[in-house]
Curated annotation (Swiss-Prot):
PROSITE patterns from the UniProt entry: RIBOSOMAL_L10 (PS01109)
NCBIfam families with a match to the protein in the record: PRK00099.1-1 (NF000955)
Gene: rplJ
Protein name: Large ribosomal subunit protein uL10
Region forming the signal peptide: none
rRNA-binding as UniProt keyword: yes
Taxonomic source organism: Borrelia recurrentis (strain A1)
GO cellular component: large ribosomal subunit
Length: 162
């Protein structure tokens, strides 16, 4: 007996596979209890930071991950699941989740960041890292400090009257 494949499920599989193509950062959220307005606001905030959010069927997501040879994420695919991908700075997207966790029923399940499985606690720590811009700014201030000190010293020397 041949098992017929539902064309809608094939379409969902292909759509989800395309959604994940070229993405190194994938996050899994439990959106249970969120209102439509809260989920829409979350989606909007994620899109503002060059990310994308999609509510998925867990079994189809498992098949897509298997097709992409990504393992270790099945435990995050239980219950209502929203998948978020990040195109640029993944920790900025993670910060958004934890802002929402404070005020809504959103739960962060885990993720896949640059080829490594992150559980909720690891993602929480990751979200607290400085952004790329903040890191560059900090680095520049570290480089600038000795030069500023030298300039102040030379200025003080020139102010001394002999």
């Amino acid at each position: 007996m041949d098992k017929k494949i539902n064309p809608k499920k094939v379409e969902m599989f292909n759509s989800l596979k395309e959604f994940l193509d070229g993405k190194d950062n994938i996050f899994f959220l439990d959106y249970r209890g969120l209102t439509v307005a809260e989920l829409t606001k979350l989606r909007s905030r994620v899109e503002d930071e060059k990310g994308a959010l999609k509510v998925v069927k867990n079994n189809i997501m498992k098949r897509v991950l298997k097709d992409k040879d990504i393992e270790g994420l099945d435990s995050y695919l239980l219950g209502p699941t929203a998948v978020v991908t990040a195109f640029d700075e993944a920790n900025v997207i993670a910060k958004i989740f934890y802002e929402f966790v404070k005020t809504t029923t959103l739960k962060v399940k885990g993720g896949f960041v640059l080829g490594e499985v992150y559980d909720e606690s690891k993602l929480s720590a990751y979200s607290k890292l400085p952004t790329k811009i903040e890191s560059i700014s900090l680095f520049m201030s570290v480089l600038k400090a000795p030069m500023s000190k030298l300039v102040r010293t030379l200025k003080a020397l020139s102010d001394i009257k002999v």
